[in-house]
Amino acid sequence: MMRHQAGLSGLRGATQQDLLDHVVMEERLAAAVPGRLLGKSAYHALTFGWLMSGLARAVTGKDMRLLFREELAEPLDTDGLHLGRPPADAPTRVAEIIMPQDIAANAVLTCAMRRLAHRFSGGFRSMYFPGAIAAVQGEAPLLDAEIPAANGVATARALARMYGAIANGGEIDGIRFLSRELVTGLTRNRRQVLPDRNLLVPLNFHLGYHGMPIGNVMPGFGHVGLGGSIGWTDPETGVAFALVHNRLLSPLVMTDHAGFVGIYHLIRQAAAQARKRGYQPVTPFGAPYSEPGAAAG
């Protein structure tokens, strides 16, 4: 499942109402029959989140929104990691989404997208659902749902802190976040050469993270998020970074993806220089972990 080989990447028949109800989606996927790509890498763009949350709920009895706070934000002592819209009294706020706020409904385009998703493109079908644009317009109802693969809300510093712990053997600022054994396991088995059946490029999915199929230009692993935000880590060099922005369903997504390569190159250069001259202390911006119901500071 964490290699995107469950054969359940498609979203045929799911309505916008279904997709905004995580329990419904977990139940639908639990009852679904795996498709022909079972056992083959086929990016589960949206269904991956409900597969994971359904499993987590069965094991822990807790939903993924709570697990984000208890297993990520709290041990890392940061408020900037949420699933969905942060509570009104949380220090973290959702930035205004720039795109596609002003895109008008287009019946022809909607019909074409639905047919494309249904009949031809496995990759597009794994990401598309009716009403996708409306879900991120206005007050963005998508943020009030529990969609673990698509509606995480994070600050760049908090996301980089999580990946930084992985880059540093599972520890950051004296906090043990993951065991060294688990971090070692994350770095293994990343030599996939066959292309992903949905995205048509080899992404080396392993334990939920993917690599980047461009030689050694972006060593390490991480994950690109909805709209083109990204978190990345390279335990071999101890480098990690995160880039987040407030664009969704934007034509600039591919530009963002290409930009990661250049940004990462500059970060690696800066890290190498810092190792030679010594590290400089950085002001600890960003709110620490906030207990539910605590007043925003």
Briefly describe each language-model feature range.
Residues 51-52, 145:
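Short hydrophobic "helix-edge" motifs at membrane interfaces and signal-peptide entry regions
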